[in-house]
From Swiss-Prot:
CDD domains: ASS (cd01999)
GO cellular component: cytoplasm
Binding site for ATP: A9, Y10, S11, G12, G13, L14, D15, T16, S17, G117
UniProt-listed Pfam families: Arginosuc_syn_C, Arginosuc_synth
GO molecular function: argininosuccinate synthase activity; ATP binding
EC number: 6.3.4.5
Biological-process GO terms, alphabetical: argininosuccinate metabolic process; L-arginine biosynthetic process; urea cycle
Underlying gene: argG
Binding site for L-citrulline: Y87, N123, R127, S176, S185, E261, Y273
InterPro entries on file: Arginosuc_syn_C, Arginosuc_syn_N, Arginosuc_synth, Arginosuc_synth_CS, Arginosuc_synth_type_1_subfam, AS_cat/multimer_dom_body, Rossmann-like_a/b/a_fold
Name this polypeptide is given: Argininosuccinate synthase
The protein's annotated pathway: Amino-acid biosynthesis; L-arginine biosynthesis; L-arginine from L-ornithine and carbamoyl phosphate: step 2/3
Length: 401
């Protein structure tokens, strides 16, 4: 009788390397190790060799970068999704895609169980397992970090050495870091004190604003229906565009974010983020919307943006709610086409200009010069009707005082 198979979300780090051996022994199962590339800069070479040497029966490496940009990042950008008005949701956007890829590989390989390396007090366990429930409820889910006997990194290293598991036992960074093309999440260590400034060694890619160039960078960003398509007049694929903005933005100290956020599991957590491209694109996109969206649509969309950010953060990407909100958002983006010019200087993003064939700004109506075409006399009747309700309320209040 063939053994059961477990599909494991594998990073090659200490936790998931130990996990291969631990799961294999505990469940007497074959392990299918799965790694997804979302644009992280950390070493991805030799992962297959390492996974097999650790005990995996097979390994799958999936380049998900293009799908991540087109299916996850662009919808979130068009939605204006910033969790609690700050976090551009880099990690939160990536988890459902990795979970979906894990499910796909599991089904292809006739696996009966799914496993991940998320901790028991974080958001990612929710994001993975809610996605599993949405896409493959028939598969059992294993979360070793919630149940295994290891209580420290040192205990895991000892287990790895005992079983000849090839892992690095060098001194660990005091920070917990997660990275993809849309941003980097940094936590733990001294960052757990919200009053302590983030040390420079916590930042992975951005230059300190104080040490950034004294000469600003000016960039033209072109959008078509809410999606960025060109930089400085050069048409670019989404992945390349984000890579370039990350490079330029990081050099100028743009994209450093420090927030205390409300986690899914009910606790507050201090997080440091680096997201140069996301910061620049969200800023430019929002300014183009100010120019092209009708007032009531622009104001109502702010509510939708928060709802969209919440569902991403909470792990309900594969949900009817997201599909419904996508319908509204797509309708709003039909006119969000144009060019936005921004300046990057010592950590800041400043608007220099914007233009669009769908611009609702009418200079003849807005001007205070002789070219003014606004009907000033119409204002008197408008104000009378606009304030009629308050006038009536005031009169009734006075009569009953």
């Amino acid at each position: 009788m063939s053994k059961e198979k477990i599909a494991l979300a594998y990073s090659g780090g200490l936790d998931t390397s130990v996990m291969i051996k631990w799961l294999k022994d505990k469940y007497d199962a074959e392990i299918v190790a799965v790694t997804g590339n979302l644009g992280q800069e950390k070493e991805v070479e030799n992962l297959e060799e390492k996974a097999i040497a650790t005990g995996a029966s097979s390994f799958a490496f999936l380049d998900l970068r293009k799908e991540f940009v087109e299916s996850c990042i662009w919808p979130a950008l068009k939605a204006g999704a910033l969790y609690e008005d700050v976090y551009p949701l880099a990690t939160a956007l990536g988890r459902p895609l990795i979970a979906k890829a894990l499910v796909d590989i599991a089904l292809e390989n006739n696996c009966t169980m799914l496993a991940h390396g998320c901790t028991g007090k974080g958001n990612d366990q929710v994001r993975f397992e809610v996605t599993f429930a949405s896409l493959a409820p028939q598969l059992a889910v294993l979360a070793p970090l919630r149940e295994w006997e290891f209580t420290s990194r040192e205990a895991e290293i000892a287990y790895a050495m005992e079983h000849n598991i090839p892992v690095s036992a060098t001194k660990k960074s005091p920070y917990s870091i997660d990275e993809n093309i849309w941003g980097i999440s940094i936590e733990c260590g001294v960052l757990e004190d919200p009053m302590t400034p983030a040390p420079e060694d916590a930042y992975q890619i951005t230059t300190s604003p104080e040490k950034a160039p004294d000469k600003a960078a000016v960039i033209d960003i072109e959008f078509e229906q809410g999606v960025p398509v060109a930089l400085d007049g050069k048409a670019m694929e989404g992945l390349d565009l984000i890579v370039e903005l990350n490079k330029v933005g990081a050099a100028h100290g743009v994209g450093r974010l420090d927030m205390v956020e409300n986690r899914v599991v009910g606790i507050k957590s201090r997080e440091i983020y680096e997201a140069p491209a996301a910061t620049i694109l969200h800023f430019a996109h929002r300014e183009l919307e100010r120019l092209t969206l009708e007032k009531s649509v622009f104001q109502y969309k702010k509510n939708v943006s928060q709802d969209y950010a919440n569902l991403i953060y909470n792990g309900t990407w594969f949900s009817p709610m997201r599909e419904a909100l996508d319908g509204f958002i797509e309708a709003t983006q039909k006119t969000v086409t144009g060019l936005v010019r921004v300046k990057l200087f010592k950590g800041s993003v400043t608007l220099l200009g914007r233009t669009s064939p769908w611009s609702l700004y009418n200079e003849d109506l807005a001007t205070y010069t002789e070219a003014d075409t606004f009907n000033h006399k119409a204002a008197e009747g408008f104000i009378h009707l606009y304030g009629l309700g308050l006038k009536t309320w005031s009169e009734v209040k006075a009569n009953n005082s």
